[in-house]
Amino acid sequence: MKKLILILSVTFALSVSASDIDLETFGQRYFATMVATQDPNATEVDLDNHLLLLADDVGHSHLPWVIDDSRLPDGKEAMREGMLFYLGTHTEYSAELLDVFTFNTSAVAIRYKKSAKGIHPQSKQAIAYTQTIMEVLEMEEGKVAVIRKYHE
């Protein structure tokens, strides 16, 4: 399954332009690759498959923790480093895509519910949570340029 997601992600990332992108399909693909990064058995390959969908200078906010969504030249690399820190944190993870909203060719929003259990890599404390999240993905040239993440 992971190889299929990789092949689809690479094919999709290389074959679309801003004018012919199907944002609903893109939102579903983004969700699938994101979920793969949270799996207890996720690997760096899963991270890279997800990161293929992002612009190199991607900006990211995750309120209330990360409020600066500035686009920086190393945005994707910084995101990869953050994702590596949390890689393998979960012992259990599930997510359900609830909605996909499209906004002409400029943005797509996904709303999903996720549940996770695991051990926080820094505090070494057990974590368990269920959240409903909305991510607004601002698009540029067929890639995610800015991610804005909100909790319900």
Q: Each PLM stretch: what is its role?
A:
Residues F12, V16-L53:
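Short, low-complexity N-terminal intrinsically disordered segments enriched in polar/charged residues
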Residues I21-L23, D48-F103:
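A solvent-exposed, acidic/Ser-Thr-rich amphipathic alpha-helical stretch
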Residues A107, T130-E152:
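Short beta-strand edge/turn micro-motifs at domain boundaries
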Residues Y30, H50, V58, M79, ...:
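Hydrophobic pocket/interface hotspot
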